[in-house]
Regions:
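Anion-binding alpha/beta catalytic cores of soluble intermediary-metabolism enzymes, centered on
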Residues: 1-208
Length: 208
């Protein structure tokens, strides 16, 4: 009998292993890199998860990863709106987080309405995109270029990469699963590790 895991994702498991609550999941491919703020699968709980501190935390995490792991010296980050029209969350929470990040030196813009942002290909002007909840970014991500995509865990001391696929437990032990996404994740992990080591070497012993 198959024993189902007690963790909702490998990211949650790794967070316990590394002893951290400050983590996030990034989806990345050649077209776009994106993550999201509200770590809940329930739409009814999304709005209360959107706080200024939560948005700022994701901006910092994505900025750090883009610099350390993806070789972006001055990352440009876009932040999406929660609603289809500008409401209280955009005015009182997301905009404040964006402005505070700007005042701290981050190159960040938003909030953008997600429909027009993706329809007009605005994402091509940015190194990373932060959505407010998972489905807001995963749908466009898959539509743009799902092949050769990875899921990358931000905020961990080690490089943690997996294929950007849903786990198909019904395919276990049937020898029918496509292996190329796993190979892509392994190659991506190697590239990310190399870039992080280069970043560490370039930034150590800097003059104050």
């Amino acid at each position: 009998r198959m024993v189902m895991p007690e963790f909702k994702s490998h990211t949650a498991y790794l967070a316990k292993v590394f002893g951290t609550t400050q983590h996030s999941e990034m989806y990345a491919n050649e077209a776009i890199r994106t993550c999201y703020v509200a770590d809940t699968p329930f739409v009814s709980q999304v709005a209360k998860s959107i706080t200024k501190d939560a948005v700022l935390e994701k901006i910092v995490a994505m900025n750090d990863s883009l610099r350390m792991d993806f070789g972006c010296t001055k990352p440009k980050i876009a932040v999406l709106a929660l609603n289809s029209e500008f409401g209280d969350e955009e005015k009182n929470t997301i905009s404040q987080a964006v402005e505070e990040a700007k005042s701290s030196g981050f190159i960040v813009s938003g909030p953008f309405l997600s429909e027009t942002f993706f329809d007009a290909a605005e994402y091509t002007r940015f190194d990373g995109v932060i959505g407010m909840y998972r489905d807001q970014v995963v749908g466009p991500f898959k539509a743009l270029a799902f092949d050769n995509s990875i899921s990358y865990s931000l905020g961990f001391p080690k490089i943690c990469v997996s294929p950007a696929l849903t786990v198909n437990y019904d395919q276990v032990d049937k020898n029918i699963t496509e292996e190329s996404p796993l190979a892509m994740a392994i190659f991506a992990a190697s590239d990310l590790l190399e870039k992080r080591e280069q970043y560490t070497e370039l930034t150590k012993n800097q003059l104050k």
